[in-house]
Design a protein with these regions (language model features):
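Conserved Asp/Asn-Gly motif in the active-site loop of CheY-like receiver
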Residues: 31-38
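Conserved acidic segment of CheY-like receiver
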Residues: 2-13, 17-18, 52
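Hydrophobic/aromatic residues located in beta-strands of well-ordered beta-sheets
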Residues: 4, 30-31, 79
Length: 187
């Protein structure tokens, strides 16, 4: 299941998003639905959703700031912005943040929305498969060789793009004589 977080300060818009499609039927799990962007960030940090769908203009932490905070926190979370505004400045900022899509709320309808998120779902699944393959290949290489801890650390640091947190790197290095340890890191 692809984990999704929905964020919109307008309760009716949020309810519409929550019910626009049958999320579970299409392979999505709603891990959070909130009108509060600060709460959304806390949910993000705890549950690491694969996809965040957020309004852009919200009081307090707006969608752009939320997207920026998510990018700074790390990970490969996909972000889709919704907005009632055709403001080109928002679009430019969203592009700078690497946002996956920007949809005007006035254009939001079930079939088009479903096509967009199913396309994102395919991308997420491909990324997870590639990441899993990369992690497995690197760890198998590490465990096949009889090398020093320092070399292990160098290899792991060079392969930082696989997205493991540093604490896992050190677990791997300290447990390098246990070939099946990498099974714990499958995503």
């Amino acid at each position: 299941m692809i984990k999704v977080l929905l964020v919109d300060d307008e309760k009716l818009a949020l309810e519409y998003l929550e019910h626009i499609i049958d999320w579970e039927y299409h392979g999505f799990e709603l891990i959070g639905v909130t009108t509060n962007p600060e709460q959304a960030l806390a949910i993000y940090k705890t549950h690491r959703p694969d996809l965040v769908i957020s309004d852009v203009k919200m009081p307090g932490l707006n969608g752009l700031e939320l997207g920026d905070a998510i990018r700074e926190y790390g990970g490969n979370t996909h972000i889709l912005f919704l907005s009632a505004y055709k403001n080109f400045d928002y679009v430019k900022q969203a592009i700078r943040l690497g946002i996956d899509d920007y949809i005007l709320k006035s254009d939001l309808e079930e079939d088009g929305f479903l096509r967009k998120i199913l396309k994102l779902k395919e991308e997420i699944i491909k990324e997870k498969a590639k990441k899993q393959y990369t992690i497995t290949a690197i760890l198998e290489e590490l465990f096949r060789k009889n090398i020093s801890e320092e070399v292990y650390k160098d290899i792991l640091d060079e392969n930082d793009y696989i997205g493991l947190h540093k604490k896992y790197y050190y677990i791997i290095v300290s447990q390098r004589k246990v070939p099946k340890i990498y099974n714990k890191f499958y995503i």
